[in-house]
Amino acid sequence: MQKPRVLSVKAFILSGGFGKRLRPITDYVPKPLVPINNIPIIEWQIRYFKKFGIKEFVICSGYKNEQIKDHLEAKKNLGAAIQYSIEKISLGTGGAIKNAFRFIDEPNFFVMNGDVITDLDPRQLQSKPNSIAVVPLRTSFGIVDITENKVTRFYEKPTISEYWMNAGIYYLSREITKYMPKKGNIENSTFPLCATKGRLSAVKYPKAFWHSIDSHKDIEECSKNIVARHYDDFIFKK
């Protein structure tokens, strides 16, 4: 079955966090400029969306936002049209979207957390507005099966396919913004409310390349997997 084309929509990139767990790097640069294999996170993200035809972005930023703008302008915005929504104080994911909503004229738009690197196909989210991408739950701990106090099986850092976690990429409608707080996160306010109203859908990506960069260990693991999965070929080859 042919996959739907990406419509002419904008993508919000939520880049306002302080990245405290990535210190001391983020004492000097904002989290979106933290390099993964010598390429800043935000460059991976913009190039990722451009692979699917999205060339208009709203970057929601706060901490060291001028560095982000200067960096991208030096790269001629990677051939994209970029607008900036600046937060004077940290607004959370919901507040950031609400604050930047003035830049949106279209009925629907994409949102991506500012620490995600992935190859999942965002076009699949367009089948229904207010859809979130989900990937299999991962754990950083070993899991043990036990029968009568004997270990029968040991799983080192497994993927738990029966459970799914938020991948930090959404396709949202204008109407959902009425449920967003002026300050706060959509993950613990807007999404739970919309879920109870039956207004939130999920699209499963069981085999997607996906990393969330929250720690120095995440940088190391993502860097290795970019090489192992030839992710740079996916991003840079036409």
For each feature predicted by the language model, list its residue ranges:
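Phosphate- and divalent-cation-binding pockets in alpha/beta enzyme and binding domains
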Residues: 21, 67-70, 99, 179, ...
